[in-house]
Amino acid sequence: MSSLVLRGVSRVEMPTISPTLGIYTRKFASQKILQRQFDVVIVGSGPVGLALAAGLQSNPVTQSLKVGLLDIQDTMKLKDWKFETYSNRCSSLTNHTRMFFDKIGAWDFARKDRIQPFQHILASDGLTNSSIHLDQKPGSEPMAFMSENVNLQYALLNSIIDKMNNNIKKPNLEFLMPCTITKLSKGENIYRTHIHTTTHGELTTKLLIGADGRNSIVRKYANISMPGWNYLTHAVVGTLKIDPLKGPAVAFQRFLPTGPLAYLPLPDNNATFVWSTRPHIASKLLRLPEETFVKFLNASFRLDYPDLSYLYQMDFSEPSKVNEQLDWRLQVKRNSNMQVPPVITEIVSGSRAAFPLRLAHVDEYVKEGIALCGDAAHNTHPLAGQGLNTGIQDVESLISALSFAIKHGQDIGSVFSLQPYFRDRYFKNHVYLGVVDKFHKLYAMENPVVTSVRTLGLSLFDRSASLKNFILSTVANGI
């Protein structure tokens, strides 16, 4: 592997966090920082990176590994997270993911009052208004849980801290953050990678794990290709206030030709949404005044597609005219029998954002001394809501492979030890990405023949208990 040099800002004063946590020490540039050795260095402290660190720490076989958790962001600040306005970055957790969090001791630290379980999903075709209902049996486990990503990070981080504080031995996990990697280069012997940083000197590791997202530094260093394509679609997200619920929490998804629109419940009459649409429409929606945007969002769950298509073509620089059209069309549609989300009353100021959507999957998950997981290895459309769950399943599989290697005296950084992880996850993720891609393309079609077949398919699906049970199992337990 060739070395990868990244620009970073050097600091005169270099803070480090002691293993006992909460105690900050400072080393000055004049002091010599010795090269430090790790068994594993995880790059990225999002939910996937933190889950991997927590999982390694709680597994009786892997807890002896010396682990470094490195991130350019100071994720340590989240241990004192103040619970304020809901974040617009949320994830749907399967029961399988929830049980993994419970197994590693993180679920106890999650703020349950900010997590919304739900047992019902209603999905509809935006052209024909045909729909399917997915409902868990009364008394069964929730179908899924909606949570802010920051709540998951808070729970994982505090579970790690709790274990470190209660470990009578010297803790084997070190937080290396905030920390910028300036260079990655090939090491010697079993310490395969040298990591040059701005604040923690030079580190060496047997295994470097990239949990650092779609723009992964680790993936680029390892020269692992990630084939894929852009969807020419942007996802608009935000946090909502809604009319008080009069029944159980329900997730709604409407498949429009411009892209799917999802409404996902949060506690205390809050909700989040993911509105996948064409880039020029997303840009126009972001510029709308908040009041008009809320009307447009309500309308997008209620109006027929020809009405929405007309509205998309309006000049959004004149919100008053858009408001007039929305008010009139919603009034006409008021007595519709369509099942729709509760009325959205406002969008939390500053919560609107948009990002491009892409499908991509790496050719390799592992190389000598390298492993990738989560978004560093695969990106997909959010329409199925399984992005984080597939990342957590990567984490479980990787921990299992490392545990097996340690038990059998193998080198944890060798390709031989890492191949079981690749074999387990690549095909499953590839199938999932392919299904989501085909589903997205199917519902983007406006051909009358295709829409007729879709309507028939949805009708048959809605009447098939076996098909529903299969989908419910996937939603609840992941891929």
Swiss-Prot record:
Biological process annotations from GO: ubiquinone biosynthetic process
Subcellular location: Mitochondrion inner membrane
Domain of life, source organism: Eukaryota
Membrane topology of this protein: Peripheral membrane protein
Cystine connections: none
GO terms for MF: 2-methoxy-6-polyprenolphenol 4-hydroxylase activity; 4-hydroxy-3-all-trans-polyprenylbenzoate oxygenase activity; FAD binding; oxidoreductase activity; oxidoreductase activity, acting on paired donors, with incorporation or reduction of molecular oxygen, reduced flavin or flavoprotein as one donor, and incorporation of one atom of oxygen
Keywords on record: FAD, Flavoprotein, Membrane, Mitochondrion, Mitochondrion inner membrane, Monooxygenase, Oxidoreductase, Ubiquinone biosynthesis
InterPro entries: FAD-bd, FAD/NAD-bd_sf, Ubi_Hdrlase_CS, UbiH/COQ6, UbiH/COQ6_monooxygenase, UbQ_mOase_COQ6
Gene3D superfamilies registered for this protein in UniProt: FAD/NAD(P)-binding domain
Catalytic activity: 4-hydroxy-3-(all-trans-decaprenyl)benzoate + 2 reduced [2Fe-2S]-[ferredoxin] + O2 + 2 H(+) = 3,4-dihydroxy-5-(all-trans-decaprenyl)benzoate + 2 oxidized [2Fe-2S]-[ferredoxin] + H2O; 2-methoxy-6-(all-trans-decaprenyl)phenol + 2 reduced [2Fe-2S]-[ferredoxin] + O2 + 2 H(+) = 2-methoxy-6-(all-trans-decaprenyl)benzene-1,4-diol + 2 oxidized [2Fe-2S]-[ferredoxin] + H2O
First-listed, main subcellular location of the protein, grouped into a coarse class: mitochondrion
Cofactor(s) recorded in Swiss-Prot or TrEMBL: FAD
Pfam families the record matches: FAD_binding_3
Family annotation (PANTHER family): UBIQUINONE BIOSYNTHESIS MONOOXYGENASE COQ6, MITOCHONDRIAL
Xref: NCBIfam families: COQ6 (TIGR01989), Ubi-OHases (TIGR01988)
Subunit note: Component of a multi-subunit COQ enzyme complex, composed of at least COQ3, COQ4, COQ5, COQ6, COQ7 and COQ9.
Family: Belongs to the UbiH/COQ6 family.
Miscellaneous remark of the record: This protein may be expected to contain an N-terminal transit peptide but none has been predicted.
Role noted for this protein: FAD-dependent monooxygenase required for two non-consecutive steps during ubiquinone biosynthesis. Required for the C5-ring hydroxylation during ubiquinone biosynthesis by catalyzing the hydroxylation of 4-hydroxy-3-(all-trans-decaprenyl)benzoic acid to 3,4-dihydroxy-5-(all-trans-decaprenyl)benzoic acid. Also acts downstream of COQ4, for the C1-hydroxylation during ubiquinone biosynthesis by catalyzing the hydroxylation of 2-methoxy-6-(all-trans-decaprenyl)phenol to 2-methoxy-6-(all-trans-decaprenyl)benzene-1,4-diol.
HAMAP family: COQ6_monooxygenase
Protein's recorded name: Ubiquinone biosynthesis monooxygenase COQ6, mitochondrial
